[in-house]
């Protein structure tokens, strides 16, 4: 699917003496509702998974094909989340870090190095390297991006059964025209991020 060597970054760090490297990615920073989620994945060194790349470049069908393959072959993986209430309390950046920490804490073994997608980092209790667009160039981050995207999408589909009036199964909580129309008609639900809706309600 891509000519990119998805193990180039990891191999650079393996050569520097790191032995256990995990990739970390998040999903759900931007939506108006639901949690922000993170995944941490440790794949066997240089494992080739055909089609592995940034989850955003894949169809939902392809992500769901890769989801069990990643879980089956991973040495370890963890999923963490921070709720909409925590997002409102501590802000989305800190909540994202909290979800990442919880994902790392779920790993059955401690990595020597965590590769984090993006350009912001905090103290996770393990050495960290940020990788801009890491989900497109790092196998471990790409695997994490797929696990976390499918996991969060499924959570929002489940929430759609509880709050059917918002269309969560379609937009997954993002601020689409239909979502804002539902907010206008029905008001906010228990899983909406009120800090994200201040501007919207300020215009009412």
Per-range role (PLM):
Residues 1-204:
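RNase H-like, Mg2+-dependent phosphodiesterase core
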